[in-house]
Amino acid sequence: MSLLLLVVSALHILILVLLFVATLDKSWWTLPDKESLNLWYDCTWNTTTQTWACSNVSENGWLKAVQALMVLSLILCCLSFILFMFQLYTMRRGGLFYATGLCQLCTSAAVFSGALIYAIHTEEILAKHPSGGSFGYCFALAWVAFPLALVSGTVYIHLRKRE
């Protein structure tokens, strides 16, 4: 049982790390000329000063929805981890981790919705930028976090506390 709890906790921490990097790092979309777009800033590599020059992203409504969903997924994932620890130490033997599992399933839904909106509305979000480019690693990390959170939520729902 302790090995299962360790694996579930490690999976949850992995999901948290993936969500933090996907939400806060600077590569949701990369353009050929070393320009990188994330949820918060539009960054261009300045070759003369060897630094990143960043400005705020556009006020696109779809991008605001993606920002809100990714932040919501982070909050829900943190909440479910805190709830899991609370339930682990206070719940009676034989109890199920329904609340934790439900929070993780909501995390999964929020990540899925955010990444899907970004994928579908990329042209509208990037309307002021030159054509070309590809999805960055932060976008891929969001898609990796989605099934992991889904599996984690399902495991929590079926997990019973044992002595």
Swiss-Prot record:
Transmembrane regions: 4-24, 66-86, 100-120, 139-159
A GO-annotated cellular component: plasma membrane
Membrane topology: Multi-pass membrane protein
Keywords attached to this entry: Glycoprotein, Membrane, Transmembrane, Transmembrane helix
InterPro entries to which the protein is assigned, alphabetical: EMP_3, PMP-22/EMP/MP20-like, PMP22/EMP/MP20/Claudin, PMP22_EMP_MP20
Glycosylation sites: 46, 56
Statement: the UniProt record of this protein carries the keyword Lipid biosynthesis: no
A matching Pfam family: PMP22_Claudin
GO biological process: apoptotic process; bleb assembly
Domain of life: Eukaryota
Major location category of this protein: membrane
PROSITE patterns: PMP22_1, PMP22_2
UniProt subcellular location: Membrane
Annotated function: Probably involved in cell proliferation and cell-cell interactions.
Family designation: Belongs to the PMP-22/EMP/MP20 family.
Name of the protein this chain belongs to: Epithelial membrane protein 3
Organism name: Mus musculus (Mouse)
Lineage of the organism: Eukaryota, Metazoa, Chordata, Craniata, Vertebrata
Gene: Emp3
